[in-house]
Amino acid sequence: VIYHNKEELEEIYSDKEYSDLDSFFTRKQLIYKYLNHEGGEKYWFSLNLFEKTCWLHIALFLARLENHESEKVKEITLDGYYIKSELDLYCYIGEEVCGVLGYMGANFSALRDCLDGSISRPVQPPLKIVWKNFEYSKHNFVGQYCEIQDMVNFISESAVLELY
């Protein structure tokens, strides 16, 4: 995987607990599972935080290779039972908009750019996001870099967000 923007890579992958070699082999394993149809919808949910970060690396790389002529998505529905962290939210939005291993950002600024059309993604701004079972997410959210209310406020700036 070639990264053109070193700062973007460092922001996505800032866990010093793992080496670059760990990251390489984890990404390799995830790509293998994806190519062999072992990593389908919501596969990311069973991954630990490091593996989710690697999942988002792969999604970012694939997004750069995509043909952006696909139909624009106007609305997605998220189930709060699958959102327990900031990385879960990025993985889930990416999957709902772009399919398995879809990319819609891996940090606040990248998500905003994807939602508002600054980065070519298959979204019709403003994207409507319906977040079911929000209370479950709220009570189980583990914020590594932010709290769930920060995410809600941030998403509300670039999308139409409905919480249920």
Language-model segments: which ranges?
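P-loop NTPase catalytic core of nucleic-acid-dependent motor ATPases
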Residues: 108, 112-118
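Short, surface-exposed helix-loop/turn micro-motifs enriched in polar/charged residues
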Residues: 103-107
